[in-house]
UniProtKB/Swiss-Prot annotation:
Pfam families: Trp_DMAT (PF11991). This is Prenyltransferase ucdE. It comes from Aspergillus ustus. PANTHER family: INDOLE PRENYLTRANSFERASE TDIB-RELATED, PRENYLTRANSFERASE ASQH2-RELATED. Belongs to the tryptophan dimethylallyltransferase family. Nonribosomal peptide synthetase that mediates the biosynthesis of usterphenyllins and uscandidusins, p-terphenyl derivatives. The pathway begin with the biosynthesis of 4-hydroxyphenylpyruvate (HPPA) from L-tyrosine, possibly by the aminotransferase ucdG. The nonribosomal peptide synthetase ucdA then condenses two HPPA units to produce atromentin. Coiled coil: none annotated.
Amino acid sequence: MDTQPQSNHPSVISAQLTPYDALDLAFTFEDRHQHEWWKRAGPVLGLTMRHARYDLNKQYQYLAFFARQIIPLLGPFPESAGSDYQRGFIPLEVSQNFQQSGTTVRLCFEPRTYSGYAIAKDPFGDLLVQEVVAKLGQVRGVKVDLQMFRQLASILNLTKDEEEELYQPACYENLPPTFKIQNIVGIQLPRSGNITLKADWFLSAKSLVSTIPITELSFEAIRTVDQGKNLFTPGLRPIEEYFRSMEMQPASPSHPRTTEFNAIACHLDDSTNARLKIYLSERLLKFDRVADIWTLGGRLKNCPGISQGLELVRALWSILQIKEGHHFPLAVNSLMMKGGDPASLAAAEKEDYPETQFFDEQFLVLNFEIRPGDPWPQPKIYFLLTELADNKVADAVVALFNRLGWVEEASRYKENLAAYYPHRDLDKTSGLQRFLSFSYSAKNGPYTSVYHWGIGG
């Protein structure tokens, strides 16, 4: 008589395997770094898709895509997350994008190499990124149009002379990390249909070496890409009008400003479907200030959904208990700006900045999405969450979901989060949920995303 438990039968064991577990039985990797990326990030990607109720075929497809196409581009697995947190970016981010219609999963990564590939020839990674998006575009199941990417790259990438100037040891070694990152790649993993790509250009280095403000670089690039078609110019116009009044300056590593443009992004689709995004950071954390940017000084007041979205931003502002005031990036940067000593710093700051002052790493990110033929750019806000314990962040996300009427997502969020970080005490960690973003459209309602940085912890 067979006395073995039924669950030990091979067919039952096979049926219990998740897509990640099944693929793990078959995959091999070229080195320990690739294997570590798979062991640490693969389960998180698999879980986020299961929790979002992706069908089984999509789970297998996207996990295999991650293993075979993305992991080889990530470079060495960080020996310690601390160094990458300090540099302001880590090679891989997984985000969950929540809407009434369902949850989708997205990846974002900075292409790297195992030995600092040709660093003297490509110190800022522009050539590598061009290679990467072209290679990914050849994968079946990926929909990509590279025409606009190539146009933007020809305008926004550093020239050879600019690279050589910035790569001089006296300059390059003193650049902060955000000035050394040129591109990142975003990957949308839809519940149905094809994978799509997004490319981001960080323009601080270009602005520094060219002495052209990032606003001007961004606006001119969009106008050039538009080529008289009037696809993106209508949506750009209110953005340009609003920020031209601020007299934006070129980027400077030693003189960070309250409002700074950072990046421009492009969804790699044909021009009639592509979307462009302009990103800025804001260190004056006041709701009135956010409301002014959100509406572009009232220019968007008649935009459908803009006021409803702003009211939900107000609710989220309260849920997160934002400390209102001027948040300086670092005390040392403030000292550099003043050229003074710590004893005289407080008095000098009080004169120039009447708001309450904080010396921390807090800031907001906002972007405006410009769509072909649409005169209304769509605002989105990102809250940096590193000052809160991860369980407190989870409480805030649950409160937001309940406020939006997403009862099922609210009931599952904390349990799901704990599954992504099985070896972490979320009462003692912070920054695993790095950002929380929010936008609103009259057509689709609220859209909020959580960005995970501590992958596989």
